[in-house]
Amino acid sequence: MVDLEAIGRRAKTAARALAKLSTEQKNAALCAIADGLLARQDKILAANAADVADAEKGGTPPAIVDRMLLTPARLAAIAGDCRQVASLPDPVGEIFDRRELPSGLRLYKRRVPIGVIGAIYEARPNVTVDIASLCLKAGNAVILRGGSDIARSVAATTEVIALALEQAGLPAFAVQSIIDPDRELVRQLLRLDRYVDMIIPRGGAGLHRFCVENATVPVIVGGMGVSHIYVEPSADFARAVPVIVNAKVQRPGACNALDTLLVHRAAASTFLPLVAAALAQHGVELRCDLEALAILADAPGHEAWNLKPASPTDFGCEFLALIVAIKIVGSIDEALDHIALYGGHSEAILTGDPISAERFTREVDATAVFVNASTRFNDGGQFGLGAEVAISTNRLHARGPMGLQELTTYTWIGEGDYLVRA
């Protein structure tokens, strides 16, 4: 039987020890984890193969099976990512926002770890190391709860991590995993606020909703949302098409992939056939409003395009597949209103008008807003953060890609010369 109280106590104790470590000690531990993953890859891959075999027997969709799968190349990449985290600047201990007050008090903020992070994720065994490495570098202990379909993979990987931590002189309990498939344990973890300081869910809408509805621990919500690109008549059409193809096709299952394409009416008759032909080459299904459908149905070559009329629900749908909704708008105001209703994750405008670009960036409320760039850039690695634990759509604590700095908080430090308050 899993004793969550004991797991929480051990994590809290480990967090206190981690907060005192030097950057060199943390980096050495991360490199030891990377070495351990490669040295013990046979054990990890065997555990993963058993998980994958069960998933295939159970009829799990191929896309999810592929997400579950670890190979020597993928494991080497995970180890490389761990080393990359070791090479990143350490945010812990950073001094900022210095000021001296009229009272003589010298005041500043020092960046400190959050404490204990709970991570709940689905069929993504790579997340085990991704989150553990980032939490450790930021001085946090972490309690991992992977999906039951990757339980063996998580157990084997966590065992390797714990051994590496011990060898590096760190508490082995700095990274713990809950392997029991009982979902009630997830509910209990979400309410373990005596020990856990933050919950990060990584998965679908159902998981995020479950966490928000059941947690007393603060939850970072993210990784979901409808992403838009709005094309203006002033855009360079020839250069805009590859941006849209990249946003939709490069990784359609990603949360920052394009879902809805908004095209200004003055650009539609010229631009839509260009982008439809390009997307069709990649097998993208085009779900069009009536006006867009009429334009495309009359365009040369439309027989080869997968055109379908859009339903009202398509414009609020995160497809996570080779599907895009297309809507014609009469103005930037209409585009902004549409994005305000359905968007909030990754939003972009393709335009040659700096006034429109400035207005778009000021008025769109999203985790990231781009001008003449793909929505796929909304990513910790692309932002130069090294890696991320999630893309937060929260407004409080962190928003957008959560890297090392977002896994810390700060303490006010006040220094005086035996000062008393007047």
Curated annotation (Swiss-Prot):
Gene3D superfamilies: Aldehyde Dehydrogenase, Chain A, domain 1, Aldehyde Dehydrogenase, Chain A, domain 2. Pfam families: Aldedh. The keyword Amino-acid biosynthesis applies. It is found in: Cytoplasm. Keywords: Amino-acid biosynthesis, Cytoplasm, NADP, Oxidoreductase, Proline biosynthesis. It is an enzyme of class 1 (oxidoreductase). This is Gamma-glutamyl phosphate reductase. The gene is proA.
